[in-house]
């Protein structure tokens, strides 16, 4: 049994109401519920945290190492393009992770095209709405099984 940590960055608490034409109508609670069900079906455990505060995400990543977290899925949201500190935290704990985005960041504003995480990630999944998380979790299962 593996434990997978899902981290949701800033403003993702507003999913379902924030710019649904970009992010869809699915809520964060819906996403977490689906991911939990997927983990249970595979015999794994899921933990999730959403924070608008960079330091809370960093502290959670630091704690993950000591807790034996096996894999991280992270949607850094706006921190994707700005947070060297969050990148450094992921590098420091050396837990494999997948970067995940609801929208296709490469078809949006130019400032969203750069990620501080992609070169460290096992992979990047973007552009499939809430399904991006499900695809990331399926990829995490495959990595854990290999």
UniProtKB/Swiss-Prot annotation:
Alphabetical keyword list: Amino-acid biosynthesis, Aromatic amino acid biosynthesis, Lyase
EC category name: lyase
Binding site for substrate: 75, 81, 88, 102-103, 112
GO BP annotation list: amino acid biosynthetic process; aromatic amino acid family biosynthetic process; chorismate biosynthetic process; quinate catabolic process
GO molecular function: 3-dehydroquinate dehydratase activity
Active site location: 23 (proton acceptor), 101 (proton donor)
Residue stretches in coiled coil: none
Pfam (any one): DHquinase_II
SUPFAM superfamilies per the UniProt record, alphabetical: Type II 3-dehydroquinate dehydratase
InterPro entries noted in UniProt: DHquinase_II, DHquinase_II_CS, DHquinase_II_sf
Pathway annotation: Metabolic intermediate biosynthesis; chorismate biosynthesis; chorismate from D-erythrose 4-phosphate and phosphoenolpyruvate: step 3/7
Reactions catalysed: 3-dehydroquinate = 3-dehydroshikimate + H2O
Domain of life: Bacteria
Record EC number: 4.2.1.10
Site (Transition state stabilizer): 18
Record HAMAP family: AroQ
Assigned protein family: Belongs to the type-II 3-dehydroquinase family.
Role this protein plays: Catalyzes a trans-dehydration via an enolate intermediate.
Quaternary organization: Homododecamer.
Protein name in the entry: 3-dehydroquinate dehydratase
Species whose genome carries this gene: Saccharophagus degradans (strain 2-40 / ATCC 43961 / DSM 17024)
Lineage: Bacteria, Pseudomonadati, Pseudomonadota, Gammaproteobacteria, Cellvibrionales
């Amino acid at each position: 049994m593996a434990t997978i940590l899902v981290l949701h960055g800033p403003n993702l608490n507003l999913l379902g109401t924030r710019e649904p034409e970009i992010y869809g109508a699915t809520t964060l609670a819906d996403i977490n519920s689906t991911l939990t069900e997927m983990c249970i079906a595979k015999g794994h455990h899921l933990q999730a945290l959403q924070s608008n505060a960079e330091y809370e995400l960093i502290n959670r990543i630091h704690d993950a190492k000591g807790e034996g977290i096996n894999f991280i899925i992270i949607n850094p949201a706006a921190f994707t393009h700005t947070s060297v500190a969050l990148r450094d935290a992921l590098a420091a704990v050396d837990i494999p992770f997948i970067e995940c985005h609801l929208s296709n960041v490469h078809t949006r504003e130019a400032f969203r095209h750069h990620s501080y995480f992609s070169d460290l990630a096992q992979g990047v999944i973007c552009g499939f709405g809430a399904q991006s998380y499900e695809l990331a979790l399926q990829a995490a299962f495959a990595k854990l099984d290999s």
